[in-house]
Swiss-Prot record:
One cellular-component annotation, GO: cytoplasm
Enzyme superclass (EC): lyase
Keywords attached to this entry: Amino-acid biosynthesis, Cytoplasm, Histidine biosynthesis, Lyase
The protein's name in its UniProt record: Imidazoleglycerol-phosphate dehydratase
NCBIfam families: PRK00951.2-1 (NF002111), PRK00951.2-4 (NF002114)
Any one GO molecular function term: imidazoleglycerol-phosphate dehydratase activity
Protein family (similarity comment): Belongs to the imidazoleglycerol-phosphate dehydratase family.
Protein's pathway: Amino-acid biosynthesis; L-histidine biosynthesis; L-histidine from 5-phospho-alpha-D-ribose 1-diphosphate: step 6/9
Encoding gene (name): hisB
Highest taxon of the lineage: Archaea
HAMAP family found in the cross-reference section: HisB (MF_00076)
Catalytic reactions on record: D-erythro-1-(imidazol-4-yl)glycerol 3-phosphate = 3-(imidazol-4-yl)-2-oxopropyl phosphate + H2O
Amino acid sequence: MRTAEIKRKTKETDITVRFSLDGSGKGTIHTGIPFFDHMLDSFTRHSRFDLDIQAIGDLEKGPHHTIEDIGIVLGQVFTHALGEGRGIQRFASVIVPMDESKAEVALDVGGRPYLVFEGSFSGPVEGVIESWLVRHFFESFIQNAKVTAHMNVSGFSDHHKCEALFKAFGVALHSATKIVYDDGQVPSTKGVL
C-alpha cells in the first residue's frame, strides 16, 4: 500500500501529514488558513489521494511559514508513499477550466525537481494569501517530491485561478502516479527515478 505519515516540528510550525496515493479523495485538513484548507481540499478530491493535514503555525506572523512547511512535508510524504515508483505512468498533463480561468499542468514524476510557473495574481488571494505564496507552496512541494512541473494559469478571478491550479495539480499527480505497467519496472532508462 502506497501510504506514508510524516511529522515535522520547528519553532514556527507543528505539522502532521498522513497520505495515501491509493485513496478515494477523502481529506481532513486543518491549517488554520481557511482558504488554504479549501485549496488543499480541492487538490485532495481531484487527485483521489487521501490526505490528513493537522498544522499549527505562527499565523500571528502571517501564513508564510505554515504554507511553506506544509508544501515541504506534503512533498516528503508524497515521496515516501511513492517509493521506487514501480509501474507508474510517470508523465501527465492536464488542462482544467474554472469559469473564466484555466490552469495547465504538465508533470514528470521522475526524481528531478524543477518548476516552471507562468501566471500572475492581482493581489492577495481572498485578502489572506499573498500571491507569491501560491507559487512558493508549489516550489516547496516540488523540491521535496522531486517532481518536474510546468504550470500555467490565466483568468480574471484570483480565487478561480488558484483553485484551477490546485485541481489541475491534483488531477495530473493522480494520472502520473497511477500504476499502469504490471511488469514491476521503474519507468526510467536509468532503472531508478
